[in-house]
Amino acid sequence: MSSGGLLLLLGLLTLWAELTPVSSKDRPDFCHLPHETGPCKAKIQAFYYNPIYDTCLKFIYGGCEGNANNFKTMDECKRTCAE
């Protein structure tokens, strides 16, 4: 392959790497769990990461059990799973 072709390939690979979003494999596994209210009856506003929409959303947490895809703030959710 000519040096011009190699340079073009390197440029395209660099562009692809810059434009490709962070892979979901870099997120903790629990970010892919569905939100889970749990069996308790409290009505606590919480946030979970939704991998389909690649964003954090609100849900009502019951106050016990559930899973690790449960954050007290939107910022905490985004820092952990969405960035």
Swiss-Prot record:
Taxonomy, superkingdom: Eukaryota
Tissue: Expressed by the venom gland.
Signal peptide as annotated in the record: 1-24
GO molecular function: serine-type endopeptidase inhibitor activity
GO cellular component terms given for this protein: extracellular space
UniProt entry tagged with the keyword Transferase: no
PROSITE patterns, per database record: BPTI_KUNITZ_1, BPTI_KUNITZ_2
Listed InterPro entries: Kunitz_BPTI, Kunitz_BPTI_sf, Prtase_inh_Kunz-CS, TFPI/VKTCI-like
Protein task: Serine protease inhibitor.
Protein name per Swiss-Prot or TrEMBL: Kunitz-type serine protease inhibitor 87
